[in-house]
């Protein structure tokens, strides 16, 4: 999978001859396309597309308006039109999941085949303490440690005695790279995104697989489940993974891939 850059925007356009289908990946806040390299390798007989949004990966921020959710929606819409993409499965993680849902109200029926959501941003996030949200771009080592515990189940057991050293080093890298994104965490911006996502969820008309860690500390599972149940939409299938937090693919890759494989097989029947 080769990343390209055009006008400061990094993207992947990786078509496969005799494809089984097309997948467009929408990354998480401070994430990037390369987070799903092994996913792309597993589904090598699918064409794979994605954008690193401004401030992510090697994509440049020309001005702050490029961090607006609606700007990201327009970028994807332009990409779909440029490459004449049709029958695409949108796959979004966290804010990328919310973006996938919002796109269902902008892209055409011809362009979307189905949706895969990994711990998607949804109105259930209102139950998450504001201190966790604001720390997604951390100010202190303690902020960073709290977010890591919310992201990955039992992360301290994974790292053992190295956990605090890991956090101290990574926090500094995080601040250097992602400080410009802190504006996206402002309550007004966050609420505008949620209202847009909520409206799109209420009109969702595509088969959707929603995979969510039951120990997620960023977008909490039970409030998200309650929100989903309030929609009464039989097209959305929710799968909660135990002993898993916000990074379900990273934490439970085999189970995640199996669920996605089953979903894609259903779509292709």
Swiss-Prot record:
Signal sequence, renumbered to the chain: none
Top EC class, one word: hydrolase
Active site (catalytic residues): 27, 94 (charge relay system)
GO CC annotations on file: membrane
Pfam family membership, one: Hydrolase_4
EC numbers on record: 3.1.-.-
GO molecular function (one): carboxylic ester hydrolase activity
Keyword annotations of the record: Hydrolase, Serine esterase
Domain of life of the organism encoding this protein: Bacteria
Family as reported in the entry's similarity comment: Belongs to the lipase/esterase LIP3/BchO family.
Name of this protein: Putative esterase/lipase 1
Protein source organism: Mycoplasma pneumoniae (strain ATCC 29342 / M129 / Subtype 1) (Mycoplasmoides pneumoniae)
């Amino acid at each position: 999978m080769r990343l390209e850059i055009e006008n400061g925007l990094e993207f992947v356009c990786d078509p496969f001859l005799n494809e089984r289908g097309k997948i467009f990946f929408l990354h998480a806040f401070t994430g990037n396309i390369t987070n799903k390299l092994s996913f792309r390798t597993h589904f090598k007989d699918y064409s794979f597309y994605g954008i690193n949004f401004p401030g992510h990966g090697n994509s440049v921020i020309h001005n702050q308006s490029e961090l607006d959710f609606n700007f990201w929606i327009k970028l994807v819409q332009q990409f779909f039109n440029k490459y004449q993409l049709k029958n695409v499965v949108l796959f979004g993680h966290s804010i990328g999941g919310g973006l996938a849902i919002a796109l269902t109200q902008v892209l055409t029926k011809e362009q979307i085949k189905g949706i895969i959501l990994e711990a998607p941003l949804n109105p259930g996030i209102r139950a998450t303490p504001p201190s966790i949200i604001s720390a997604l771009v951390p100010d202190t080592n303690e902020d960073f440690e709290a977010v890591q515990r919310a992201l990955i189940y039992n992360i301290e057991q994974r790292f053992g005695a190295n956990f605090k050293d890991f956090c101290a080093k990574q926090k500094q890298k995080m601040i250097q790279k992602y400080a410009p994104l802190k504006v996206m965490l402002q309550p007004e911006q966050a609420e505008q995104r949620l209202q847009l996502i909520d409206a799109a969820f209420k009109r969702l008309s595509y088969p959707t697989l929603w995979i969510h860690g039951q120990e997620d500390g960023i977008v909490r599972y039970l409030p998200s489940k309650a929100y989903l149940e309030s929609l009464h939409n039989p097209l959305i299938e929710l799968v909660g993974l135990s002993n898993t937090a916000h990074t379900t693919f990273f934490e439970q890759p085999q189970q995640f891939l199996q669920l996605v494989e089953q979903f894609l097989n259903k779509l292709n029947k």
